[in-house]
Amino acid sequence: MNDGENYWNAFRSHKRSATDGPTLSPWMVTVLQATKLLLFALCNIVLTLGSVFSKLIVLIMATNIVPRAHLIGKFARKCTKAAVRRTSTTTAGIYLSLLLIQCFPDTINLIRSGIDMWKGQCGQLVKSVVVLESLRAIGLAVLSFHVFPQLDLARCLVLSACFPLVAVLQRSLVAMVSAARTGRSFRNRLGRCFVAIPHVIMFLVLMSSCYVWALFDNKFTAIIALPIGVICTSAGFWESWIDTTHSGTSFDELYRLKYAVRKMNTTTKLIVSLMRIVCTVSVLVSAVYINDHKKLNSSHFVKAFFSFSTRQPHTRLLLLATGIIVLHFVMRGISRFLAALDLHPFSFVHPLSIAPLIAYGYVRYACQSPTCSIARRLARFGLHWVCDQWFQSARGIASPDFYICLIWLLVGCYRGWRLVRQRYFDTNEEIISSMPPVCNGLCIEQSLVVFQHSLNRQEKTMLTEEEDISDENDELRIRNDEVDRVSTVYGCATMWHETETEMRQVLRSILKLDVDHATRMNNKKANELRYRLEGHIFFDDAWEDVEEDGIEKRQPNEYFNMFFDLLNEMTGERLNEEGKMETRILVNTPYGGRLVVKLPSGTLLFVHLKDKKMIRHKKRWSQVMYMYYLLGHRIMDCPLSIEDRQQMADNTFILAIDGDSKFEPDALLRLLHLMNAKSDIGCACGRIHPIGNGIMVWYQKFEYAIAHWFQKAAEHVFGCVLCAPGCFSLFRASALMDDNIMHKYTKTASEPRHYVQYDQGEDRWLSTLLLKQGYRIEYAAASDAETYAPEGFEEFFNQRRRWTPSSIANTVDLLMDYKRASENNDAISYAYIAYQFLVIFFSMLGPAIIFTMLVFAQVAAFELRGSDVMLYNGIPIGFFIVLCFTTESNIQLIYAKYMSIAYAFVMLAVLVATSSQIVLETVLAPTSLFIVTMVGIFFFAACLHPKEFTNIIHGVVFFLMIPSTYVFLTLYSLINLNVITWGTREAVAKATGQKTKKAPMEQFIDRVIDIVKKGFRLISCREKKEHEERREKMEKKMQRMELALRSIESGADVKKILDATEEKEKREEETQTADFPIEENVEKTQKEIQKANRYVWMTSHSLKVCERGKLKSAEKVFWNELINAYLKPIKTTPAEMKAVAEGLASLRNQIAFTILLVNSLLALAIFLIQKHKNVLSIKFSPIKNFRWTKMNEMTGQYEETDEPLKIDPLGMGIVVFLLIILFVQTLGMLLHRLNTMIGAFQEVKNLYEYGVSPVINTKNDDERIMNNARLMINSLGVSTGHAADGYTRHRGEESDTGNVLYKLQKARLAKRMQRSALSTTE
């Protein structure tokens, strides 16, 4: 059988695609696993030893409150040289240190809550939490200030183990009530009684701690304080006796707070913090009087707090307390970190269960074998080690309370183990991890417990951020069921005149998404991240006029044809028996045309062909198209309730990409995961990697790297990202639909600054609108995407000419409106605004800073006079400024290119001069220290990004191009601010309808050719006139026939078309003899012909294989209304264009003059200060006996000197501010890398949970990898709240960024009522 195929020629060659396996290479998986194990071990050690250290320090301070002149301990007898000299100030220092340890976290919470309440964030007071936390504060303070001073260290430790008293009592009562319940058999009751007996015994044992020492004949006087302290602390430790059984009971609020089902609201936080501070201070005051400190008064407390001297014990005590506070914050952070990694300390080594035993063992050992080094260290703080308060007997004879104390210790450790023991959950369960919302400094182990809880289906509907429970019948209540988990993602790409390589790149990414989407939707595993996918490509200016056989047609241009051929090649679609492709449908639309494609795995891809004669072109208007089409027409116009449409908007996301973007499905999944974690995120963006070839791309690789490593990470950590790149960002639909965002994005430029802010950087403007409305923009470093960067010098400069003014304009706009931005957006604080102000301020001073650096480096390298070098450098830069004001861009770019090459050699001199300065002045000199620190930080950042480490190599190119980019590029961008053309891909001027400016020689040649052509026309005009008339008549007849044939194919009325054509010919003949045309009939005729021509493009050679479709009437109406409202092609008159040009020139002059003046003044000031360095400098010696090398002007030799360095105060100030910015960004980078590392650990864990090996076996594991490898992003450990912040599912109805559909509906109803009222009055 032969069907036309040669089976013998079935062998093939094709490009090998990247392996669809895990994104983490095997060596990275191994390193991450080893790092994870090491971190787990280190964190457990820090938690355990830190808890022991904290507990011992607190107890040592507490046992030293009351002087012990009557007691001579073992340490005192052995270590006579470590005598302790106590003063009243030292005693006041002990009191203040314990107060600081306990109340400092509460003070921080009080301040933060006050600020939040000032912003209007309140809530209903949870009284039970206030009462119990007050009891805990009273209990801990009573024990620390009244009871512990009368005990020794060992007895203090065993008494601390009795805090689970109420928890044991509760278990006893539950068991006894269960045994006494009616309806049970005798055997069942007897069995339950036996179960209750151990709990009753433990309760009685722990209860004995309230009175046992009062039975002995000793000097213990805190008989009343002891039971009060133990019972209050035990009752206040409510996390130990509240569990899941209290859900729905009178303790339901406590249950929700413990398991982070609900956050502790601002009002409750403030009152709890205030009451804890008041209770602690009150108990401290009472202790000062009851403990009979005869010489202690308020002046001693004031002196202890304000008199700072590291030689005094009270200052050392306060510093020690500060160290303990820092340790507590670190341990709380470590506990949260382990919870985020889903790594919990082993139950038997948790601080709550093991710290008392370790501390007790160490105290017993130290008391049996006293070490004088401990005594000497404690003596420096005015403290001593208290071993045995009473019953000082011979060696080997135990005290009467020894055994009962040991039982307390064992019972307390057992109850601690029961509280922190690990629970095992099914992989399909949704787990919440939480920590106690209050930090207890005097008993830190209680604040290090991580609780886990599995949400059942009923509880999921009650998850809120605040305390108000949604009404079950509320129309706007959003349910969290399985349907909510399936998100809808619209992938929207904007194209113009991309190359074949760029188109192939974005198509390959879309096809990978198609496969991943189908795999996930078909896989029904619980808790798997699934999404619906639909692709949209908006082809800007995709049409051109083509004249064929004398007939002018409007057809898709060569770029779309190239895209269509490429799409067929990559999808492998074949023709059916009728010679058609069933998966390709062509549709006429009011904006041009549309190609609908069904991808191999079922995803629909809509290719929108925009005609600039029918709709506005450029990227911003394409974005307006898909926003209004997908969010307005698809969501707002659908016949659903407000609740359902709100749910659609919350679960709908737009993936904005460029026509050359390249990314993996995992990158999208990471962004989706981030968006699902927090509801206030309006947009999430990934790490953009520039690709391409050439020196300019190398420069951009390093530039992008440090921008993401430092600036973007710092923005993410300390505030929020200011710009979401349009090449790869995920937007939440409900955020875009909110007020002052999508609608305001349609605003056309009416002022000169609007052209810069709106049209030159549309991505930055959209980001600014989101930030002002209160939405966060977050950055996910692990979500990688690639895009082609400009490879040529001119294209790079033109790109930055657009970006720089737009970035500055939008940042200034945000800073000028900082009050509203800070009020609406919780992520934007005044400190963050100040940081952004510093960044933009120093970026504007970049030319002056780099210019002066070049000058002084050349002075040092070539040993020239500073004034001469400043003149030599000032002339070329000044000449470039003149060129920017007076000449065309191409001349400016040619000059900038050659000067960039020249200054690259100058930078080598800078490198030599800087190296010599470091050698001569040593690394400790301020300038040398700054340079070495900056280089070290860059290298450290590269080490923290191992996958991107090679970018550090491109830092050499970045260094050589510093003058080019920080001087010439900055000046070029600002002075050409009035040029609003894009400047990239300008080779295709044919499509834009504009002619590019030609060189003078080209213009001369064109004039000569025109003259020759006109001469030939004059010679042959008479001979060809009659021939031309006959030919025109023939062409008109052929045109009529061709129109008729094509009209038959399209189903149009042939007679009507022919009549219209004849009428048009008659009108043309009449217009040749008449003095005026009949315009209305001509326009009508043209419309008829245009209507017939609408189907001509579908019959082109490449597109005739596609099926034909028809737009639905509702969608056609929508597009017509949208175009009329926002997207009509903008027609400007010459007068309007002149006014715009003049306005832009005026704006350019103002801004350029200001920046040039400031930079000139700064450069001159630095130069003059350096010239008069001997008078206007600051003398600085980094260390004592500092020596450096200096040239002797008399001998010309280098000699060592001990003279102080002479520092320029202005330059030093700039260096200090730059260092501050760099350190802030480095801190932000470290915190962001920690967050990214948590995600990487989670991926490694999920790799093995879903059965994916990090080593790819392409022979046996292809199918398994296809089904499982993409599941590794679905980690619940990070998305659920693993700290005191609680579990966030959605925001409350009162939120400004919540229920967008409800707000829009209210506005619509208000307009309707207003119109009806007006009509009534009329």
Curated annotation (Swiss-Prot):
The keyword Glycosyltransferase applies. Glycans are attached at residue 297. Its EC number is 2.4.1.16. One of its GO terms (cellular component) is plasma membrane. Disruption phenotype: RNAi-mediated knockdown causes the production of abnormal eggs characterized by a spherical morphology, the absence of the eggshell chitin layer, increased permeability to small molecules and a failure to divide. Loss of polar body formation and loss of egg-3 and mbk-2 cortical localization in oocytes. RNAi-mediated knockdown causes polyspermy in 40 percent of animals and a failure to internalize egg-1 after oocyte fertilization. Simultaneous RNAi-mediated knockdown with mat-1 prevents the formation of the eggshell chitin layer. One of its GO terms (biological process) is chitin biosynthetic process. Residues 455-486, 1019-1053 form a coiled coil. Keywords: Cell membrane, Coiled coil, Glycoprotein, Glycosyltransferase, Membrane, Transferase, Transmembrane, Transmembrane helix. Residues 1-39, 150-156, 215-221, 291-316, 364-396, 858-865, 914-922, 973-1148, 1231-1322 are extracellular. It is found in: Cell membrane. Residues 61-128, 178-193, 243-269, 338-342, 418-836, 887-892, 944-951, 1170-1209 are cytoplasmic. The keyword Transmembrane applies. The chain crosses the membrane at residues 40-60, 129-149, 157-177, 194-214, 222-242, 270-290, 317-337, 343-363, 397-417, 837-857, 866-886, 893-913, 923-943, 952-972, 1149-1169, 1210-1230. It catalyses: [(1->4)-N-acetyl-beta-D-glucosaminyl](n) + UDP-N-acetyl-alpha-D-glucosamine = [(1->4)-N-acetyl-beta-D-glucosaminyl](n+1) + UDP + H(+). InterPro entries: Chitin_synth, Chs-1/2_IV_N, Nucleotide-diphossugar_trans. Pfam families: Chitin_synth_2, ChitinSynthase_IV_N. GO terms for molecular function: chitin synthase activity. It is a multi-pass membrane protein. Gene3D superfamilies: Spore Coat Polysaccharide Biosynthesis Protein SpsA, Chain A. Belongs to the chitin synthase family. Class IV subfamily. Essential for the embryonic synthesis of chitin, a component of the eggshell. This is Chitin synthase chs-1. It comes from Caenorhabditis elegans. The lineage of its organism: Eukaryota, Metazoa, Ecdysozoa, Nematoda, Chromadorea.
